[in-house]
């Protein structure tokens, strides 16, 4: 095996994480963390969708749906749900409060898995709008990152009940002018895009074309699932090479 990260997660680090699961990881503590919030499951277009629905104690709070990406889950939001729903408890003001909805994307977490193709960004955006209306929110905002950013942008473009969006991964194509006369900053961005396409996107090709073939190995082996995901945490997070940070 290669001892560095040039070909993926090193064996030594894989063993370290597997040992942590066996000897230190406490699922019940994680369960307590998640159970601080209100969890529900509903059926949208034939797929069971799990979501957190945390209403603010402030009645005039603004409804907000937050969407995660890959490799991620609603766990990403456990540190912000309470400050968003009850800002006065964290030094904020009542006018900044939100009623927060955090759905798990189809096939993620406790959500069901679609049995047929078609659950792309547009269908998920439509389903999220349906979910918010079912919860009584005829006017709401949307936030997301990674695939959640794509879903959020689609909600903002095509869905009438959403009045505002925020993404932490804005998506846009370079203009022809910027391609012909790029600034140094744009050159750096284009080089990063080229690197991603050539060296960092193999997972996406496999998952988007033959997910079932890959799925057998990931479902059968917890360590395989961990290795597939932790390599992306190492590569994409601002963690100084230590995903546990």
Where are these regions (language model features)?
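Short His/Asp/Glu-rich catalytic/ion-coordination signatures at enzyme active sites or charged loops
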Residues: 1-7
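Catalytic cores of eukaryotic secretory-pathway lumenal/extracellular enzymes that build
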Residues: 2, 12-219, 224-226, 232-237
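Short, intrinsically disordered, charge-balanced linker/junction segments flanking boundaries
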Residues: 241-245
């Amino acid at each position: 095996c290669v001892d560095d990260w040039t070909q993926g997660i090193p064996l030594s680090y894989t063993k370290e994480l597997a040992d942590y699961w066996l000897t230190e990881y406490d699922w019940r503590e994680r369960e307590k963390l998640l159970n601080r919030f209100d969890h529900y499951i509903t059926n949208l277009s034939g797929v069971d969708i799990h979501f957190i629905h945390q209403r603010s104690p402030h009645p005039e709070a603004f409804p907000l749906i937050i969407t995660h990406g890959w490799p991620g889950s609603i766990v990403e939001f456990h540190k912000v749900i309470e400050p968003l729903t009850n800002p006065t408890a964290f030094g904020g003001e009542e006018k900044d409060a939100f009623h927060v909805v955090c759905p798990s994307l189809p096939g993620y977490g406790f959500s069901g898995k679609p049995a047929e193709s078609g659950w792309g960004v547009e269908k998920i955006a439509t389903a999220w709008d349906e979910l918010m209306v079912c919860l009584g929110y005829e006017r709401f905002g949307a936030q997301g990152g990674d695939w959640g950013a794509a879903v959020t942008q689609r909600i903002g473009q095509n869905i009438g009940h959403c009045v505002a969006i925020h993404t932490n991964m804005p998506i846009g194509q370079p203009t022809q002018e910027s391609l012909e006369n790029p600034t140094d900053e744009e050159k750096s961005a284009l080089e990063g895009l080229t690197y991603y396409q050539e060296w960092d996107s193999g997972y996406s090709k496999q998952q988007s074309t033959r997910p079932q073939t890959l799925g057998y190995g990931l479902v059968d082996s917890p360590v395989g699932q961990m290795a597939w995901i932790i390599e992306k945490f190492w590569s994409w997070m601002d963690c100084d090479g230590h995903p546990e940070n």
